[in-house]
Amino acid sequence: MNKIKKSLQSINLKLFAALLVMGLCPTIYTTLKVFFLGQLPGDWSYSIAGQLSWVNLIYEIVSEAIILPLFFFMGSAILNKDDFSNKLKTGLIVSGGIYAVLSIGIILFTEPMLMFMAASPDIIKESATYIRIESVANVAGVLLNFALVALIAIGKDKLVYVFTALKLAFCVVTDTFLISALPFSLNLGVNGIGYSNIIVNTILTIIILMVLSKEGYLVRNKQKLSFAWCKDFFKIGSVSGLESFVRNIAYMLMVSRMVNVVGGSGVYWVANNFIWGWMLLPVLQLGELIKQEVSTDKNKVKTNTFGYFTITTFICILWVVTIPLYKPFMQYVLNYSDVDKLFHLVMILFVFYIAFAYQNIFDMTFYGRGKTNYMLFESVVTNSIYYGGFFIAYKTGLWIPSLDGIALMFGVGTLFDAIVSGIAYRYYLRRYMIPKSEKSLSS
């Protein structure tokens, strides 16, 4: 007990609280969008919005190859203002350019992609329009994320909190005018979400770039832009990008596509918003804390891990205690009509996300210590053995998908991945954290 207490005392709980507040903002405006969609007649709007989930996986692959390594490269250049300015300018060009090319490709091939992903023919036209709008918003979104990383790198952390709160405020205003059922709303439906994202991301990006310019990082000078640093950038980003590719492609084919096949994309999308937005909020923000703490000090892995496990256990107990509140929340806050179906789906996944919560400690330690090769190992093992086996079973007719069956498949896959992650974590501890003297005694 004393060991746990000491471990908790060494954790930056104030930063964890700040991260929780920061993470709460996007959760609130995502929930607001779900609420407004619930005011529209029928369930088709959820199904259309649900199609964006697999499109976002494509963007996530590129994002994890670009955004994750940025913290290292931007931070390493902070002592040299000219070098930092060059990386900021060229980084904006490269990331914006890559996202623009990707978005153009998605815009051109949206309908064939929707057909490949087995979307219902009734919503393909409307889904294609919405995805194209969101593709434009994603270009502004990556520029916003890049600019936020730059603010963190120059020590303007408090401004990041300010802009996160501003994003929430802007989203509430734009969603109210574009999506809501209020008399003065334009009633653009699901497309209003995309237009709202374009407006908010663009405005915030411009404001942050103005702040960076005022700080002297985006001023015009005669110095020629150098893209040489991008070689190392892509070298490091390729590992996290490859890991994300393996993980997300498997999810797209074995979960997102299968959910479309059984016609459950709408309820599955709302369930994911509830789980990832509310249940996993403290887990994911704890992960951000773990990344920050172990990246600066290797010994934090040894001193803080008991505390991380204690916090995670408390979060999981909180999930169980608040189960009676789930249905009222789904009905009155998410404004979802078929509450029983949504609750049933969430409860199927519930136990498996407890395993994910603990796996989060392992994976974020790997990210923080720069051991993304362990993450790649996990993805390859889980997706080739587990999901590969299910794919063969599906193709041979041994497994016939249903919404509950897909949820169980994904849930057990999450548990399988957590076990693989735990094995990799144990290997990491033995290799890097246990002194040689202790290893020789144990052997």
Language model regions located:
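Interhelical loop/hinge segments that connect adjacent transmembrane helices in multipass membrane
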Residues: 1-17, 188-197, 206-248, 429-443
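Transmembrane helix-bundle signature of multi-pass secondary active exporters and lipid flippases
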Residues: 17-72, 137-141, 238-292, 315-319, ...
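Helix-loop interface residues and adjacent transmembrane-helix termini in multi-pass membrane transporters
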Residues: 40-43, 153-154, 187, 262, ...
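Small-residue-rich hydrophobic transmembrane alpha-helices
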Residues: 47-104, 144-153, 268-324, 359-367, ...
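Alpha-helical transmembrane segments of multi-pass membrane transporters/permeases
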Residues: 82, 150-177, 191-194, 198, ...
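Short membrane-interface helical motifs at transmembrane helix boundaries
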Residues: 101-129, 317-344
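Alpha-helical transmembrane segments of multi-pass membrane proteins
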Residues: 108, 121-147, 275-278, 337-362, ...
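Membrane-interface helix-loop junctions in multi-pass transport and translocation proteins
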Residues: 169-205, 340, 384-422, 427-433
